[in-house]
């Protein structure tokens, strides 16, 4: 099945035979070829952009998993941001609905958002829900700086990943996401997360 093939490729890529590539560098060429041949494909409109809903996060199917949890948390949120050089990042961070218009993201302070926080500027953000499994795996994988999560997802799925321009933010988002929540992160606004 397609899913089994993707899983097999994931395992092979996470445990490459470095010794083999050192002895026989040409054996690594297929992986390099795949990386170069899989840039994301820009498309006009994404699946998650067909219907625009009013600014009310409480209307979305975001569960509260346990009775004592501090709120509703997005399951497998694909968080899209970009740095000052325009390089996009796709990660997975806990996302808690605080009210109709605020979604709290649990950042690691030393990571991607630190640059925006140091400058005291808002960071454009898109939180995407749904999409192909290779995209979800790509978001949580430790990748080298010169390989984007979108490229890696393309390699895993053996086809260029379609991306589309976000409607309200200067970001490219996965075109196959079911739901796209667009907004910004203000480094001067913080809230306590949870309880869990």
At which residue positions do the language-model features occur?
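Extended, highly charged
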Residues: 1-196
């Amino acid at each position: 099945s397609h899913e089994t093939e993707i899983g097999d490729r994931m395992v092979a890529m996470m445990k490459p035979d470095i010794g083999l590539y050192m002895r026989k560098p040409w054996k690594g060429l297929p992986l390099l070829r795949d990386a170069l041949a899989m840039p994301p494909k820009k498309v006009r409109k994404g699946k998650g952009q067909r219907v625009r809903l009013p600014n009310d996060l409480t209307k979305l199917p975001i569960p509260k998993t346990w009775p004592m949890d501090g709120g509703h948390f997005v399951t497998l949120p694909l968080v899209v941001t970009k740095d000052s050089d325009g390089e996009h990042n796709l990660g997975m961070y806990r996302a808690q609905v605080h009210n109709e218009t605020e979604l709290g993201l649990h950042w690691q302070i030393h990571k991607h958002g630190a640059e925006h926080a140091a400058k005291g500027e808002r960071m454009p953000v898109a939180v995407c829900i749904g999409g192909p499994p290779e995209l979800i795996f790509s978001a949580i994988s430790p990748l080298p700086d010169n390989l984007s999560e979108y490229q890696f997802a393309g390699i895993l799925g053996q086809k260029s990943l379609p991306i589309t321009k976000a409607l309200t933010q200067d970001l490219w988002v996965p075109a196959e996401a079911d739901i796209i929540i667009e907004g910004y992160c203000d480094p001067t606004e913080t809230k306590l997360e949870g309880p869990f």
